[in-house]
Amino acid sequence: MSDLASRITAPAAATPATETDAPAAASSTLAVPDGAADGANSSGLQESNYDVEVQLGDPDTDSPLSSISSFSELGLPQGIIDGLLAMNFKKPSKIQARALPLMLSNPPRNMIAQSQSGTGKTGAFVVTILSRVDFNQPNQPQALALAPSRELARQIQSVIQSIGQFCTGLVVDAAIPGAISRETGVKANVVVGTPGTVMDLIRRRQFDVSQLKLLVVDEADNMLDQQGLGEQCVRVKNMLPKTIQTLLFSATFPDHVKSYAEKFAPQANQMKLRQQELTVKGISQMYMDCPSLKEKYEVLCKLYGLMTIGSSVIFVKTRESADEIQRRMEADGHKVSALHGAFQGQERDQLLDDFRSGKSKVLITTNVLARGIDVSSVSMVINYDIPMKGPGDQSPDAETYLHRIGRTGRFGRVGVSISFVHDRKSFTALSSIAEHYGIDLIQLSPDDWDDTEVKVQDVIKSSRAKPDYAPTQEKAA
């Protein structure tokens, strides 16, 4: 078979199809992942070979610019130190070493922080939350964390409870649909929730925000950029005390969102990375050259039929596509699950819990799980559909690509991402994303499964990620 690059130079030979088409009536998008640090001599996080760039919101202040080498330098309560050690966070990651002195300074200052997936940003803001809370007031809300999905909110709640397990008096509520009783309202000193539910609780006077000291917005670029979520975040912020400390965290901050974030968190200290430093080095990024849209599904089943992959996530574009691929894969003898926004809250919780525990090994999902969710056992992510944005999917979505592949290669482990391309549009979109981040993509061919298996297993069997890791074969851009 001729490769895709040659086929797209002769459009007549390619199958004219759009990304809204599906594998025999399927379509596409979704994602997954959880985890505490594993690790031997440190937190076990994905460490970088670059320095974090810091910009002070007010250069005239005496904000600390130093980088800590141990958590003990921060003067944290012993309960937090014990919790970090219990979670195997033995020393700060680079993002934690630079961010924590700034976030814990007094008087409190706002922060806009950008860091790769799996580098410890959640741990950084969780330590800040626990440090700001008076545990003698277990039922008085003092810190609020906002997340774009119930899955991520539940995960953050779990991390706070784990690191804060020795903090007597810590109570963490999840403000997600169906979780807070209308009779009791919020009775916790830390609240993690989605913007719509939080806003509703405040309006019904079931969430006392008068003593809130800290607001954290995780996956802030997505939260502020989406019309509905962005408006809800602003409304929630306007209901909170004017003196509240605001922390915005994300792996990506597109320019148009960055200016909005600076208004949302004024005079914020900022931490950022250069564009080419955003992709996680422990992820070997590949692409599969599929003969046509129809044959994408056959290639997918062949991939899972030949290899022992472990936990993996398949991202598709639509709910219908996720359901159709699940139906067809199960009919072909594969054990898979689908998770997307059409499922009710408790059912979504159970599906994700089953995936975390290993009861389910393959999760087909849309972008509802592309951000923040950590399942440390995920060794492969498949972009069945290349992420696109704009009316009619007019342009590639580089930020969503980065968040999707960040579901693997967590906490210093290695991982594989495989993006499926089948025509001029999908190939051009992936090429644009690769150029955007300076990625050398490794080509896989459905005509040589022995070679494909060697390349993929070469990565998965590697014990830990190295900064420059890639399989030992020729790369193709």
UniProtKB/Swiss-Prot annotation:
Which gene name belongs to this protein?
DBP5
In the bilayer, the protein is annotated as: Peripheral membrane protein
Which residues of this UniProt protein bind ATP? Answer: 115-122
Assembly and oligomerization? Associates with the nuclear pore complex.
High-level lineage: Eukaryota, Fungi, Dikarya, Ascomycota, Pezizomycotina
Q: Which SMART domains match?
A: DEXDc (SM00487), HELICc (SM00490)
Instruction: Please list the reactions this protein catalyses.
Output: ATP + H2O = ADP + phosphate + H(+)
Q: Which UniProt keywords apply?
A: ATP-binding, Cytoplasm, Helicase, Hydrolase, Membrane, mRNA transport, Nuclear pore complex, Nucleotide-binding, Nucleus, Protein transport, RNA-binding, Translocation, Transport
Query: Which positions does the motif Q motif occupy?
Result: 69-97
Q: Which residues are in the Helicase C-terminal domain? A: 299-460
Comment text on domains: The Q motif is unique to and characteristic of the DEAD box family of RNA helicases and controls ATP binding and hydrolysis.
Compartments reported by the entry? Cytoplasm; Nucleus, Nuclear pore complex; Nucleus membrane
Top-rank taxon of the source lineage equals Eukaryota
Output this protein's name: ATP-dependent RNA helicase DBP5
Q: Which PANTHER family match?
A: ATP-DEPENDENT RNA HELICASE DBP3 (PTHR47958)
Task: Set out the biological process GO terms recorded for this chain's protein.
Answer: poly(A)+ mRNA export from nucleus; protein transport; translational termination; tRNA export from nucleus
E.C. designation(s): 3.6.4.13
The GO terms describing molecular function are: ATP binding; ATP hydrolysis activity; inositol hexakisphosphate binding; RNA binding; RNA helicase activity
Q: What does this protein do?
A: ATP-dependent RNA helicase associated with the nuclear pore complex and essential for mRNA export from the nucleus. May participate in a terminal step of mRNA export through the removal of proteins that accompany mRNA through the nucleopore complex. May also be involved in early transcription.
- Composition-biased stretches, type Low complexity, lie in 1-29
- Give the enzyme class: hydrolase
- UniProt-listed Pfam families: DEAD (PF00270), Helicase_C (PF00271)
Q: Where is the Helicase ATP-binding domain?
A: 102-271
